[in-house]
Amino acid sequence: MQNDEGKIVDLYIPRKCSATNRLISATDHAAVQINVGHVDPNSGLYTGDYTTFALCGFVRSMGESDAALNRLCVKHGLAKAI
């Protein structure tokens, strides 16, 4: 919800899992948020930009977080397909 000035005034904004599109509840203490940095292809240095991914506890408990993160990085062009 926004006020008259256009600022977001909600107390809690739920996140969605980047891999499954499930809502991450406030009580999902196994969920993680990972920032993947962008690297310049020529110099190999960090550019200061990053992409944020959120993984829910369900994905982590199934042991699929590594595969999900790899798939998301390939989809967003942050890594090469293996």
Swiss-Prot record:
Pfam families hit by this protein: Ribosomal_S21e
One GO cellular component, as annotated: ribosome
Classification via InterPro entries: Ribosomal_eS21 (IPR001931), Ribosomal_eS21_CS (IPR018279), Ribosomal_eS21_sf (IPR038579)
Single GO MF descriptor: structural constituent of ribosome
Chain ranges passing through the membrane: none
A Gene Ontology biological process term: translation
UniProt KW keywords: Ribonucleoprotein, Ribosomal protein
Family (UniProt): Belongs to the eukaryotic ribosomal protein eS21 family.
PANTHER family recorded: 40S RIBOSOMAL PROTEIN S21 (PTHR10442)
Record's protein name: Small ribosomal subunit protein eS21
Gene designation per UniProt: RPS21
